[in-house]
Amino acid sequence: MTFLQRLQGLADNKICAFAWFVVRRFDEERVPQAAASMTFTTLLALVPVLTVMVAVASIFPVFDRWSDSFVSFVNQTIVPQGADMVFDYINAFREQANRLTAIGSVMLVVTSLMLIRTIDNTFNRIWRVNSQRPWMMQFLVYWALLTFGPLSLGVGISFMVGSVQDAALASGAPQWSGALRTAATLTFMTLLLWGLYRFVPNRFVPARQAFVGALATAFCLETARSLFTWYMGNFDGYRSIYGAFAAVPFFLLWLNLLWTLVLGGAVLTSSLSYWQGEAFRRGFDSRGRFDDVLKILLLLDAAQKEGKALPVQEFRRHINMGYDELGELLEKLARHGYIYSGRQGWVLKTGADSIELNELFKLFVYRPLPVERDHVNQAVDAVMTPCLQTLNMTLAEFDAQAKKRQ
């Protein structure tokens, strides 16, 4: 078997082809550049975010212990062993921030919300979202992530760590306490990432796919943190260069690696919807979009006749494409008045006998230029005009013709 034949065999393998699809999306979304931007934003907003979270918890005395558990969790997750000095500085800054005036406190909240908005925008770009949530809905989501998310995590961590310690002592094997604690941290890291991947994008994300992406990312984060700690403990040449400031550059490197893995997990999660039916082999090929638009409208027409609305999952059962690409088509059709999204799902605004195929073709494939036409435009127009004339029919007429070919 030649080398080219082996490469062709890898390309035909479903797992290898899907892995290559994820890698290409990782590159197309410019994850390293996005991670670098998120690192800088986190560096500016980490102290305000922790301050706001702990300040909200301090309003309810019963949450004090749980907020401490959350801060400890952040210390273990964000700051690897060897860069502990950085977190000492962060805690010192956070304590100083408690003495701020009302205007300073407002700025802390604004800075914290800006970090969450940056995360939201980055995730929506990965999921190819064009329409943002209403402003009030965005604020409620951001505030929930900033307050109730950490408090819930703190409650869970406190409960789990206590249960782990009790189980280890009851079994007479306290040496397992560290392993169980790591498992507990890994569990809640997975839940936190699941919440991010499931609810932050303004796009439908199946719970199972969000869990798979979160679990893979949590394992990668824990492995990276262990390797980072091992390196800093065994190779201390960097200390002779940076001296007392050695923890700072490594903290920045770790933040960058952390965001690269988290955003990489988001890319993986958004790509999982392409696994079914091997839709990843087509990828984001725009050549079949007109066909997909017709399938979407025909499905909605059939549902309209039955008095039903269609959720996004129903489209995916009939059309071989990812949820992000499907969402783009639905949003574009909605912007141009063909469909709308209700509580139960998507609904056709008009009947199939009122939808002209040539107008859809102009919207998704080719639209003649009305002004400033040079010789190239005129030549293309001459070629495409017969095609547009052929498509001079309604969706209902096209449906009748298509059914004759079954």
Swiss-Prot record:
Location within or outside the cell: Cell inner membrane
Task: Enumerate the transmembrane spans.
Answer: 43-63, 100-120, 139-159, 176-196, 210-230, 248-268
User: How does it sit in the bilayer?
Assistant: Multi-pass membrane protein
Subcellular location, principal = membrane
Protein's UniProt name: UPF0761 membrane protein NMB0524
Similarity field: Belongs to the UPF0761 family.
Q: Name one GO cellular component term.
A: plasma membrane
Please report the organism this UniProt entry assigns to the protein: Neisseria meningitidis serogroup B (strain ATCC BAA-335 / MC58)
Q: Which UniProt keywords apply?
A: Cell inner membrane, Cell membrane, Membrane, Transmembrane, Transmembrane helix
